[in-house]
């Protein structure tokens, strides 16, 4: 019985990072818009699409999108927004005002809206 309890405990502890990763608890409930210049192109090689943008004040934002498949279904690809282009992201920023990170639900590029999390807001 101890062996089973140990295995269950190890399994539960190994799953904690995944649960922590997928939560929105570290982000504000209110929605924020950030417009910036793409400094690191869209990457769809991970659990979520990512990119970096620099706002008018010079802050570099870590932008997290939906999982790659959902992000692509919304029309966002790795080649859509070249470095230097302007994009507006809409989503939930990190609760820490000194952390420039946002989980986006939508983004606008070249006048087109891309809804990566339909129904989220």
Locate predicted features.
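Short nucleic-acid-contacting surface segments enriched for D/E, G, S/T with interspersed K/R
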Residues: 73-89
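OB-fold/S1-family single-stranded nucleic acid-binding modules
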Residues: 94-118
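Short, structured beta-strand/loop micro-motifs enriched in basic residues and often containing a Trp
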Residues: 65-73
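Short, glycine/small-residue-enriched coil/turn segments at secondary-structure junctions
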Residues: 24-44
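Short aromatic-glycine-enriched beta-strand elements
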Residues: 44-54
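Extracytoplasmic
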Residues: 31-33, 46-48, 86, 102-104
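Sec/Tat signal peptide C-region and signal peptidase I cleavage site
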Residues: 16-20
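Positively charged n-region of N-terminal signal peptides that target proteins for export
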Residues: 1-4
């Amino acid at each position: 019985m101890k062996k089973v309890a140990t295995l269950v405990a190890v399994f539960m502890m190994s799953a904690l990072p995944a649960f922590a990763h997928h939560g929105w608890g570290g982000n504000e409930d209110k929605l924020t818009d950030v417009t910036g210049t793409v400094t690191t192109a869209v990457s769809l090689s991970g659990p979520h699409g990512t990119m970096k943008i620099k706002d008018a004040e010079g802050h570099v934002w870590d932008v997290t999108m939906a999982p790659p498949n959902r992000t692509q279904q919304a029309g966002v690809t790795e080649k859509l927004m070249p470095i230097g282009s302007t994009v507006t992201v809409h989503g939930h920023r990190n609760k820490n005002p000194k952390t420039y990170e946002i989980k986006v639900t939508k983004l606008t590029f070249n006048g087109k809206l891309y809804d990566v999390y339909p129904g989220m807001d």
